[in-house]
Amino acid sequence: MLHDPNDDPSEYVIYVIDRGSSSGLRRIWGDEIQDVKRGFLVLWNAEIPVHRVIRVERGGRVIWERGRRARGRR
């Protein structure tokens, strides 16, 4: 998403655990992410540990979810 110039970061939505919100989750749009460094998603105003990521969607479809096995794996 960040390194492929043909990929549009705004198509991605990343859901992270957020202890400060009433729902316990925070939604981050891909174009908010400036970089990924040392296990953190770097936003313009925050750094979020990657271990808090629970789901990634692209174009409204789930492409990764914590605890979900990748397709084709047994």
From Swiss-Prot:
It comes from Methanopyrus kandleri (strain AV19 / DSM 6324 / JCM 9639 / NBRC 100938). It holds the Pfam family MJ1316. HAMAP family: UPF0248. Belongs to the UPF0248 family. It comes from the Archaea. Signal peptide: none annotated. This is UPF0248 protein MK0350. InterPro entries: MJ1316, UPF0248.
